[in-house]
Amino acid sequence: DDSIKIRYKRNLGLRPYQKIILQLSIALIVAFVVYKNELIRGDLYIPFTKNTVSLGWGVIPLVVFIFIATTNSVNLTDGLDGLAASTTLVYMAGIAAIIAIVAADADKNGLSLYVKEYQGLLTVCFATVGSLAGFLLFNCFPAKIFMGDVGSLALGGVVACVSILGRLSLYIPILGVMFATSAVSDIIQVVHYKRTKRRVFLMAPFHHHLQKKGLSETRIGFLYSTITGIVALICVLTLI
Protein backbone atom coordinates (compact mmCIF):
# COMPACT_ATOMS: atom_id res chain seq x y z
CA ASP A 1 0.00 0.00 0.00
CA ASP A 2 2.75 2.45 0.98
CA SER A 3 5.04 1.43 -1.89
CA ILE A 4 2.25 2.11 -4.41
CA LYS A 5 1.72 5.58 -2.92
CA ILE A 6 5.44 6.35 -3.13
CA ARG A 7 6.06 4.81 -6.57
CA TYR A 8 3.04 6.29 -8.35
CA LYS A 9 2.93 9.48 -6.26
CA ARG A 10 -0.77 9.15 -5.43
CA ASN A 11 -2.54 8.86 -2.10
CA LEU A 12 -4.87 6.03 -3.17
CA GLY A 13 -2.56 3.07 -2.53
CA LEU A 14 -4.36 -0.26 -2.66
CA ARG A 15 -8.00 -0.04 -3.69
CA PRO A 16 -10.67 -1.20 -1.18
CA TYR A 17 -11.47 -4.40 -3.11
CA GLN A 18 -7.76 -5.27 -3.24
CA LYS A 19 -7.48 -4.89 0.53
CA ILE A 20 -10.56 -7.07 1.06
CA ILE A 21 -9.15 -9.79 -1.21
CA LEU A 22 -5.87 -9.80 0.74
CA GLN A 23 -7.74 -9.82 4.06
CA LEU A 24 -9.96 -12.67 2.88
CA SER A 25 -6.90 -14.68 1.84
CA ILE A 26 -5.28 -14.25 5.25
CA ALA A 27 -8.59 -14.90 7.03
CA LEU A 28 -9.01 -18.22 5.20
CA ILE A 29 -5.50 -19.28 6.23
CA VAL A 30 -6.22 -18.38 9.87
CA ALA A 31 -9.57 -20.21 9.75
CA PHE A 32 -7.94 -23.33 8.29
CA VAL A 33 -5.18 -23.29 10.94
CA VAL A 34 -7.77 -22.90 13.70
CA TYR A 35 -9.92 -25.75 12.40
CA LYS A 36 -6.95 -28.09 11.98
CA ASN A 37 -5.38 -27.23 15.34
CA GLU A 38 -6.11 -30.10 17.73
CA LEU A 39 -6.18 -27.70 20.68
CA ILE A 40 -8.78 -25.39 19.16
CA ARG A 41 -10.87 -27.10 16.49
CA GLY A 42 -14.29 -25.46 16.67
CA ASP A 43 -14.28 -24.69 20.40
CA LEU A 44 -15.03 -21.17 21.64
CA TYR A 45 -15.27 -19.83 25.17
CA ILE A 46 -18.70 -18.48 26.10
CA PRO A 47 -18.19 -14.90 27.37
CA PHE A 48 -18.18 -14.40 31.15
CA THR A 49 -17.84 -18.16 31.75
CA LYS A 50 -15.16 -20.85 31.57
CA ASN A 51 -17.42 -23.05 29.48
CA THR A 52 -16.85 -23.73 25.78
CA VAL A 53 -19.18 -24.36 22.87
CA SER A 54 -18.14 -26.42 19.85
CA LEU A 55 -19.03 -25.12 16.38
CA GLY A 56 -17.20 -27.80 14.39
CA TRP A 57 -16.60 -26.73 10.78
CA GLY A 58 -18.88 -23.74 11.43
CA VAL A 59 -15.90 -22.05 13.04
CA ILE A 60 -14.39 -21.50 9.57
CA PRO A 61 -16.92 -18.92 8.25
CA LEU A 62 -17.11 -17.37 11.73
CA VAL A 63 -13.34 -16.87 11.89
CA VAL A 64 -13.28 -15.41 8.37
CA PHE A 65 -16.02 -12.92 9.28
CA ILE A 66 -14.45 -12.03 12.63
CA PHE A 67 -11.00 -11.52 11.12
CA ILE A 68 -12.19 -9.20 8.34
CA ALA A 69 -14.64 -7.33 10.59
CA THR A 70 -12.10 -6.81 13.37
CA THR A 71 -9.30 -5.73 11.04
CA ASN A 72 -11.47 -3.10 9.38
CA SER A 73 -13.06 -1.97 12.65
CA VAL A 74 -9.65 -1.17 14.14
CA ASN A 75 -8.74 0.57 10.88
CA LEU A 76 -11.87 2.75 11.13
CA THR A 77 -11.01 3.63 14.73
CA ASP A 78 -7.69 5.07 13.57
CA GLY A 79 -9.18 8.48 12.83
CA LEU A 80 -7.77 10.63 15.65
CA ASP A 81 -4.35 11.02 17.23
CA GLY A 82 -3.64 8.08 19.52
CA LEU A 83 -7.18 6.69 19.37
CA ALA A 84 -6.58 3.29 17.75
CA ALA A 85 -3.28 2.78 19.56
CA SER A 86 -4.61 3.57 23.05
CA THR A 87 -7.82 1.58 22.60
CA THR A 88 -5.90 -1.41 21.23
CA LEU A 89 -3.39 -1.20 24.09
CA VAL A 90 -6.18 -1.49 26.67
CA TYR A 91 -7.88 -4.25 24.65
CA MET A 92 -4.67 -6.30 24.50
CA ALA A 93 -4.06 -5.83 28.22
CA GLY A 94 -7.62 -7.00 28.89
CA ILE A 95 -7.44 -10.03 26.62
CA ALA A 96 -4.05 -10.90 28.19
CA ALA A 97 -5.68 -10.94 31.63
CA ILE A 98 -8.45 -13.23 30.35
CA ILE A 99 -5.90 -15.53 28.69
CA ALA A 100 -3.91 -15.67 31.94
CA ILE A 101 -7.03 -16.76 33.85
CA VAL A 102 -7.88 -19.40 31.25
CA ALA A 103 -4.25 -20.62 31.24
CA ALA A 104 -4.25 -20.92 35.04
CA ASP A 105 -7.45 -22.94 34.84
CA ALA A 106 -5.90 -25.23 32.19
CA ASP A 107 -2.80 -25.69 34.34
CA LYS A 108 -4.97 -26.62 37.32
CA ASN A 109 -6.61 -29.32 35.19
CA GLY A 110 -3.26 -30.66 33.96
CA LEU A 111 -3.68 -29.46 30.36
CA SER A 112 -0.02 -28.57 29.78
CA LEU A 113 -0.35 -28.27 25.99
CA TYR A 114 -2.99 -25.57 26.38
CA VAL A 115 -0.79 -23.76 28.90
CA LYS A 116 2.10 -23.59 26.37
CA GLU A 117 -0.30 -22.30 23.71
CA TYR A 118 -1.56 -19.57 26.02
CA GLN A 119 1.97 -18.62 27.09
CA GLY A 120 2.79 -17.92 23.45
CA LEU A 121 -0.30 -15.74 23.10
CA LEU A 122 0.58 -13.86 26.29
CA THR A 123 4.00 -13.09 24.83
CA VAL A 124 2.33 -11.55 21.77
CA CYS A 125 -0.03 -9.56 24.02
CA PHE A 126 2.80 -8.15 26.16
CA ALA A 127 4.91 -7.35 23.09
CA THR A 128 1.98 -5.50 21.51
CA VAL A 129 1.19 -3.57 24.70
CA GLY A 130 4.84 -2.55 25.08
CA SER A 131 5.13 -1.52 21.43
CA LEU A 132 1.96 0.56 21.60
CA ALA A 133 3.05 2.24 24.83
CA GLY A 134 6.25 3.36 23.12
CA PHE A 135 4.39 4.35 19.95
CA LEU A 136 1.89 6.47 21.91
CA LEU A 137 4.71 8.73 23.10
CA PHE A 138 4.84 10.01 19.52
CA ASN A 139 1.27 9.30 18.39
CA CYS A 140 -0.77 10.97 21.15
CA PHE A 141 -2.15 14.45 20.41
CA PRO A 142 -0.53 16.28 18.73
CA ALA A 143 0.82 13.28 16.82
CA LYS A 144 4.31 13.33 15.35
CA ILE A 145 4.03 9.83 13.85
CA PHE A 146 1.01 8.23 12.16
CA MET A 147 0.52 4.49 11.75
CA GLY A 148 -1.60 4.63 8.57
CA ASP A 149 -3.23 1.53 7.10
CA VAL A 150 -0.03 -0.48 7.48
CA GLY A 151 -0.32 -0.01 11.24
CA SER A 152 -4.05 -0.06 11.89
CA LEU A 153 -4.77 -3.07 9.67
CA ALA A 154 -1.86 -4.92 11.27
CA LEU A 155 -3.16 -4.08 14.76
CA GLY A 156 -6.61 -5.31 13.75
CA GLY A 157 -5.03 -8.54 12.55
CA VAL A 158 -3.21 -9.00 15.87
CA VAL A 159 -6.39 -8.32 17.87
CA ALA A 160 -8.29 -10.84 15.75
CA CYS A 161 -5.61 -13.56 15.70
CA VAL A 162 -4.82 -13.48 19.43
CA SER A 163 -8.51 -13.64 20.32
CA ILE A 164 -9.26 -16.37 17.76
CA LEU A 165 -6.27 -18.55 18.69
CA GLY A 166 -7.15 -18.15 22.36
CA ARG A 167 -10.67 -19.43 21.58
CA LEU A 168 -11.93 -16.02 22.73
CA SER A 169 -13.49 -14.84 19.47
CA LEU A 170 -16.83 -14.09 21.13
CA TYR A 171 -15.11 -11.57 23.40
CA ILE A 172 -14.13 -9.35 20.46
CA PRO A 173 -17.44 -7.42 20.12
CA ILE A 174 -17.63 -7.15 23.93
CA LEU A 175 -14.10 -6.19 24.91
CA GLY A 176 -13.70 -4.43 21.56
CA VAL A 177 -16.95 -2.51 21.96
CA MET A 178 -15.36 0.74 20.78
CA PHE A 179 -14.03 -0.94 17.64
CA ALA A 180 -17.55 -2.25 17.02
CA THR A 181 -18.93 1.25 17.64
CA SER A 182 -16.72 2.65 14.87
CA ALA A 183 -17.83 0.01 12.38
CA VAL A 184 -21.54 0.02 13.25
CA SER A 185 -21.80 3.83 13.28
CA ASP A 186 -20.15 3.98 9.86
CA ILE A 187 -22.51 1.36 8.42
CA ILE A 188 -25.58 3.07 9.92
CA GLN A 189 -24.49 6.42 8.49
CA VAL A 190 -23.94 5.07 4.97
CA VAL A 191 -27.12 2.95 4.82
CA HIS A 192 -29.35 5.65 6.32
CA TYR A 193 -27.94 8.37 4.06
CA LYS A 194 -28.44 6.28 0.92
CA ARG A 195 -32.06 5.65 1.88
CA THR A 196 -33.09 9.06 3.22
CA LYS A 197 -30.32 11.49 2.19
CA ARG A 198 -30.09 12.41 5.88
CA ARG A 199 -27.33 11.73 8.38
CA VAL A 200 -27.75 10.02 11.74
CA PHE A 201 -24.39 11.34 13.00
CA LEU A 202 -22.76 14.69 12.31
CA MET A 203 -19.89 12.65 10.90
CA ALA A 204 -18.98 8.97 10.92
CA PRO A 205 -17.36 6.97 12.44
CA PHE A 206 -18.66 7.89 15.92
CA HIS A 207 -15.42 9.47 17.17
CA HIS A 208 -15.75 12.14 14.47
CA HIS A 209 -19.33 12.79 15.65
CA LEU A 210 -17.95 13.41 19.15
CA GLN A 211 -15.29 15.67 17.67
CA LYS A 212 -17.97 17.69 15.87
CA LYS A 213 -19.81 17.95 19.21
CA GLY A 214 -16.79 19.74 20.63
CA LEU A 215 -14.85 17.00 22.43
CA SER A 216 -11.09 17.22 22.04
CA GLU A 217 -9.07 14.38 20.53
CA THR A 218 -7.46 13.75 23.93
CA ARG A 219 -10.83 13.45 25.69
CA ILE A 220 -12.21 11.12 23.02
CA GLY A 221 -9.13 8.91 23.30
CA PHE A 222 -9.49 8.85 27.09
CA LEU A 223 -13.21 8.01 26.75
CA TYR A 224 -12.59 5.10 24.37
CA SER A 225 -9.77 3.70 26.51
CA THR A 226 -11.76 4.08 29.73
CA ILE A 227 -14.83 2.31 28.34
CA THR A 228 -12.64 -0.51 27.00
CA GLY A 229 -10.89 -0.74 30.37
CA ILE A 230 -14.18 -0.92 32.30
CA VAL A 231 -15.50 -3.66 30.02
CA ALA A 232 -12.19 -5.54 30.38
CA LEU A 233 -12.44 -5.31 34.17
CA ILE A 234 -15.99 -6.67 34.11
CA CYS A 235 -14.90 -9.56 31.86
CA VAL A 236 -12.00 -10.41 34.17
CA LEU A 237 -14.03 -10.17 37.39
CA THR A 238 -16.69 -12.55 36.06
CA LEU A 239 -14.00 -15.20 35.48
CA ILE A 240 -12.26 -14.97 38.85
List each model region and its residues.
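Alpha-helical transmembrane segments
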Residues: 3, 28-37, 42-44, 49-51, ...
